[in-house]
Every structure is written in structure tokens, then in C-alpha cells.
Amino acid sequence: MVLEYQQREGKGSSSKSMPPDSSSTTIHTCSEAQTGEDKGLLDPHLSVLELLSKTGHSPSPMGQNLVTSIDISGNHNVNDSISGSWQAIQPLDLGASFIPERCSSQTTNGSILSSSDTSEEEQELLQAPAADIINIIKQGQEGANVVSPSHPFKQLQKIISLPLPGKEKTPFNEQDDDGDEDEAFEEDSVTITKSLTSSTNSFVMPKLSLTQKNPVFRLLILGRTGSSFYQSIPKEYQSLFELPKYHDSATFPQYTGIVIIFQELREMVSLLNRIVQYSQGKPVIPICQPGQVIQVKNVLKSFLRNKLVKLLFPPVVVTNKRDLKKMFQRLQDLSLEYGEDVNEEDNDDEAIHTKSRSYCRNKKAENSKKKSPKSNKKPKRKKQKFFTSWFTWGISITIGISFGCCVTYFVTAAYEHQTVKSLSLRPSILASLLSLDSSSDTINTPATASPSSTEQFLWFDKGTLQINFHSDGFIMKSLTIIKETWGKMNTFVLHALSKPLKFLENLNKSSEFSIDESNRILALGYILL
């Protein structure tokens, strides 16, 4: 390979002295012998390096090392077109300017990205927590195109289209071998693949990734009847839902939430287990069949108690159109709020902090203003309660005292009118309950009453007074007193209500009351007032 490179260099320096057919024959023989081994991703890039070294500039040691390590492709037409395109880039210092800056460590450790490398990075981002994904989105919005230092030799891949100059003669294409070379030069442009390391400061290609798109509110529908449910969703809400394109659980983190539709509880449990394993804490909306709401809630309690899943909306029955409409409206509102939150995150961190602080301050001020009138009203309410409580207690006490006085008055008046009209000495209430039955339960008291009074009310035997506490005497007398008191109260109230203006006259005219008891009536009136 070194000999071949030196031969080509000699031909480029003394092209006029050598015959034109010699260069083409040597290159064809080398390329045809190695066509089976030179098919690879590095062939176009190595051919570019070789052709850049043939433009009259001094070849770099890096280009010599790369040429000696890997063979050059044998397709002359493509090589010529690529050489022309890269010669057009040379005035802009995009091709050869960064080659001397590279060191040997970068060339040995540098690699070209393939589709497998990008897919691995995408999987790592998809399986990362939500906070990491948000940080990646923020970094992409800030315009940071520098790869992290943990991967200093990652390369960026970009397909670009460059215009080709007119037909020129170069040290490598002095004489056309076939008619295909003319067709290659007649093309206006050619598509090439350029790979650069992240360590270069010029012409850095951006890396495109699906994970750096703005997050969208999307719900994944899982279940055997998911397609039929998706068709039944109104068109205005279908944009919020999506059916799984691939039966891959690793795509769960891409969605905002997951809707599970099931017909049996076994299917629900299996879907929940998959979600717990792969969804990374995405909220869930269960949609069950009629009559399964209680069982579904019992199953969800165990998952919620262990903090395995989160509910975005309570369980909904498929046939309940009203609950489904509420769910759709709620999800639409959440999608609008989610979009507003994402737009707010696009602003600078300082602006967000100031807004949040000002918002908190305003909210605290509003809360303090709301609390201040409440604090002023609280003692007033306490005073009102205090006043009303004393008022009610006073009224209740006066009513109770007056009622008690009335009862005692009527009781004493009724009993005295029955028993003490003929007595010169008024006995007490206890004396009225005494009976003269000769029984064993007796209490001996000295006799002090006159014989006239003993003939009418009390009987004495041998200087002793016998008191009987049997039921036939004490209970019956108490019942008669209560009965008479109730009757007198009824008559008194009826007369008072019927003739309020002649209240005192009716009391004086009644046969049961005497004129001498007017002092008691006046005392009762003062108490009632």
C-alpha cells in the first residue's frame, strides 16, 4: 500500500513526462484485486483524504497513516467527483483546516456513528427518568451542541449536498478511461457523507434526535379492545390518544399516560404489571366493563397503597357515555395546561425564579389581606355569641324560677284549703302526710297539740305520735296533691287567657280563693314581671 501511494504521488508530480495510460492501469489492477475487501464505510472518507493530499499541498502525516492502514476504493468516477467537491470546499477552510489539529489519540479513538449507536443512545434517554429528559430538552433549547466530556470522541453525522465545479483536469484524472467519467462531471451536485469529531471548533454538524422534540400530551391505549375504543372516541379528542405501533414495552416512557382497557381482571393485573415494570411512574386511566367498578377499585387499592401506579382519572365504564365525556374534557384541559408548562420551561431560569417569587409574594399578600378581616370579625362573632348565650340563659332561669314559684304556690294553696280551714294552727306539709294507722313502723314524738286540733286532724295515743310510711298513705296523698295542682293550674291559665283585663277580679271572685290571699297574688305578679 505504501508503494502504491508513492507511485500515485510520483505520477501527480510528473504527469506530463509519463504516458497517460500507465496511471489508469496501475490503479485498476490494485482496485480490482481488492474489490471484495474494500467495501466498507471508511472507503469514501479515505479516498477524500488521499485526493486532498494530491492537490499540490504537502501531505499530512495523518493522511499517510490512514492510507497505509486501509485500502482505497477502486471506483474512479466517484473518486473524481468527490475530489472535485472537496476541492471546492478548500477555499472555505472546511476540509483541510482541521486535519493538522488532530492528534494521534483522536484518530485512533475516533469512530464513525452508525444507526446502532444512535439507537442505543435513544434507548438510554427513553429509559431515563422524567427529570433527566427535561434537562436534556432544556440543554437542546439553550443551543448546547457540545457532547458531554464522558464521550469526547463521539462523532456527528450529516448528509450534505455540495455543488461541483466544471470539468477540470487534476493529477488523478488527466485522461478519461471510460465515458462514465464525463457523466459524473456533468452532474450538478452529489450527495456525500461527512463525519467530524466533536473536538473540532469549525463546521460542527448538529446531532438530530427524536428525544429533543417538544413533549406532547399523548396517552397510549393498551388492551385487546383498544382499537375499537379508539374508533369510538370523538374526532376532537382523538389527537390525545394513540395506539401502540409496536408491541414493545420500552416505548411506555414516551407517553404522558397510559389508558388500559380490559374485559377481565386477569388482563388488568397483567397490564398493570407491565406498566409498573416499564412505564417509569406514568399515570394510568382504567376503563372497565359494566359491573366491575368495585373489583377494579379493590385491585387498584393494593397498587396505590404500595405506590406502584398513579391514577390520572378514576375508573370509567365503557358504556357510560357521560363519564367518558367528562374524562375527555378533563384530559383536554390537562393537555392545554401541560403545553403551557412546557412553554414556561423554555424561558430563562432567572425569569422563572423571579416570576415564581413574585407570584408567591403576591399570593401571600392576598392571603394576609383575606385573613385580616376574618381576624377582625372573629371577636365580634364571639361577642354576639356571648351576648346571645347570656340572654338565653337569663330567660331560661327566669322562666324556671317563675314556674317553680307558681307550682309551689298552687300546691300549698290547694293543700291548705283542703285540710287547714278548720285548724287554728296551720300544720306543715310534713304534718299533712302523717297518718294515724296503728302499724309497726312508728316514730314516737311528744304530744304538744291541743285536744281540739287532734279531734279533727291528728290522733294521739298515750302521748305518742305515730307516722305511717306505707304506700297506701304516702303515695296516694302525693298523687292527689299533684292532681289537684294540675287542675288548678289549668283553670288559672284558662281564666287568664280568656279574660286578661279582669285577671285580678276573676281571682278574687273565685270561691276557692279568699280576699285575704291578695298579698300572695301580688307577690306572684312581681315574680312574673
Swiss-Prot record:
GO molecular function: mitochondrion autophagosome adaptor activity
PTM (free text): Phosphorylation of Ser-114 and Ser-119 are critically important for mitophagy and for the ATG11-ATG32 interaction. Phosphorylation depends on both HOG1 and PBS2.
Chain residue ranges for the region called Disordered: 1-41, 345-381
Polar residues composition-biased segments: 25-34
Modified residue annotations for Phosphoserine: S114, S119
UniProt record, GO biological process: autophagy of mitochondrion; mitochondria-nucleus signaling pathway
A GO CC annotation given for this chain: phagophore assembly site membrane
Impact when changing S119A: Decreases mitophagy and impairs interaction with ATG11
Effect of S114 to A/N/G/Y: Abolishes mitophagy and impairs interaction with ATG11
Chain intervals with Low complexity compositional bias: 12-24
Assigned keywords, A-Z: Autophagy, Membrane, Mitochondrion, Mitochondrion outer membrane, Phosphoprotein, Transmembrane, Transmembrane helix, Vacuole
Membrane topology per record: Single-pass membrane protein
Composition skew (Basic and acidic residues), residue ranges: 1-11
Places the protein is found: Mitochondrion outer membrane; Vacuole membrane; Preautophagosomal structure membrane
Transmembrane feature ranges: 390-414
Basic residues composition-biased segments: 370-381
Subunit record text: Interacts with ATG8. Interacts with ATG11; to recruit ATG11 to mitochondria.
Similarity field: Belongs to the ATG32 family.
Free-text function comment from the UniProt entry: Mitophagy-specific receptor that recruits the autophagic machinery to mitochondria and regulates selective degradation of mitochondria. Mitophagy contributes to regulate mitochondrial quantity and quality by eliminating the mitochondria to a basal level to fulfill cellular energy requirements and preventing excess ROS production. Recruits ATG11 to the surface of mitochondria. Also promotes autophagy-dependent peroxisome degradation.
Protein name stated in the entry: Autophagy-related protein 32
Gene: ATG32
